[in-house]
Regions:
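Glycine-rich beta-alpha loop segments
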Residues: 1, 11-178, 183
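Short, charged/polar "capping" segments at the starts of alpha-helices
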Residues: 7, 110, 204, 273-279
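Acidic/glycine-enriched connector segments
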Residues: 139-237
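Short acidic, glycine/serine/threonine-rich loops at helix termini
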Residues: 113, 144-148, 207, 247-250, ...
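Short, solvent-exposed amphipathic alpha-helical segments in soluble enzyme
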Residues: 118-121, 212, 250-255, 282-286, ...
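C-terminal functional extensions of proteins
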Residues: 227-229, 263-328
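Short beta-strand segments
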Residues: 101-105, 135, 196-199, 238-239, ...
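Short, acidic/small-residue loops that bind anionic groups at enzyme active sites
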Residues: 129, 156-165, 238-239, 245, ...
């Protein structure tokens, strides 16, 4: 493939010749806020429709989220493959035990106490050398990357930034995206990074620009499995709905079978939520006691400091050594 051909792909299918150009489908590196939101003006929220992300999402919907047209699905597959390739090159620079995931719902408001708690957890862990990973959307996901973005600053500065975000409490409120960009301008981040892994399947939920590195996929199943696989250093589960519950059991199965050659910590934030409202925590404990699950590293607390300690207590020396095979 040569640059003079604009890296075009040709193939024959059903006696038709398709030409798939990589003007935006093939990536050599991950997105960041500048590239994903190229063309977005924080002073004009309506400019989202014509920015890069808005354009891709509109095309995704118009072409069919579940399209069977090979001329549609092949470019998406090529794009996702290139994203995965860039993602694992990026992760190659990290010790797998320093990659920590956060799972939780998009419904968490910026004004919720849990939003600040997630941000503080992420901030502390980032300052301890962890790479924080989430699904890269709003709610608990945004809180993860907001906290990582504020790493290296005081808690008072985090609270000042949070006050700026409260002008748009949820992603459905006008100004949600613009306020994030204003915070990023007011509190620039040059030292710490975080990884968001969003999807255009949920493109109506905008990707948080606080993630410094963004692996955005068309295929949601690849994206979900990737988060759970790369977060060898542990997963923090925050209140969510059906998707979060699914991810809890995906992670439990992965740890039980040691898919990544190690059981990673599963730290739950929200005692009442995970023991009463959606009682998955006592269920997992019971399954462990009856030998149905093995080697799950479970903990639960409402205190951000407790959760940080649980994650930091997980050391490579305490587990079976794994090579950096997933990150190469």
């Amino acid at each position: 493939m040569t640059s003079s051909l604009k890296t075009a792909f040709f193939f024959v299918y059903s006696q038709k010749i398709y030409c798939i150009m990589d003007n935006y489908q093939i990536r050599k590196e991950l997105y960041d806020a500048a590239s994903l939101y190229a063309g977005f003006d924080p002073a004009d929220e309506n400019s989202y429709a014509t920015c890069y992300d808005g354009h891709v999402y509109a095309d995704f919907v118009a072409s069919g989220k579940r399209s069977r047209d090979l001329a549609v699905t092949l470019p998406r597959t090529l794009h996702d493959h290139s994203i995965s390739d860039a993602l694992y090159r990026f992760l190659g620079g990290y010790d797998p035990y320093n990659v920590v995931g956060v799972m939780g719902g998009h419904a968490m408001k910026r004004s919720d106490a849990s939003f600040r708690n997630v941000a503080l957890i992420s901030k502390r862990l980032t300052e301890h050398g962890k790479l924080m990973v989430s699904g890269g959307g709003p709610g608990a996901m945004e809180a993860t990357h907001f906290g990582a973005w504020m790493a290296g600053r005081s808690d008072a500065e985090l609270d000042e930034a949070l006050q700026m975000l409260l002008a748009a409490d949820t992603f459905r409120d006008a100004g949600w995206l613009s306020t994030a960009f204003r915070v990023m301008e007011r509190f620039p981040q040059k030292q710490f990074r975080s990884l968001g892994i969003p999807t255009w399947l949920y493109g109506h939920e905008p990707s948080t620009p606080f993630a410094t590195d963004i692996a955005k996929y068309y295929d949601n199943s690849i994206r979900e499995d990737t988060i759970l696989t790369v977060a060898v250093g542990g997963i923090i589960f925050t209140p969510g709905s059906a998707g979060t519950i699914q991810e809890i059991f995906q992670e439990a199965a992965q740890d039980h079978y040691k898919t990544c050659d190690v059981s990673s910590p599963m730290a739950f934030m929200g005692v009442d939520y995970f023991t009463r409202e959606i009682p998955v925590y006592p269920f997992l404990e019971d399954m462990m006691a009856r030998g149905k699950y093995h080697d799950l590293l479970l903990s639960i607390s409402d205190n951000p400091d407790d959760i940080v300690r649980e994650i930091l207590a997980f050391r490579e020396a305490d587990a079976v050594h794994i090579p950096n095979k997933f990150f190469k």
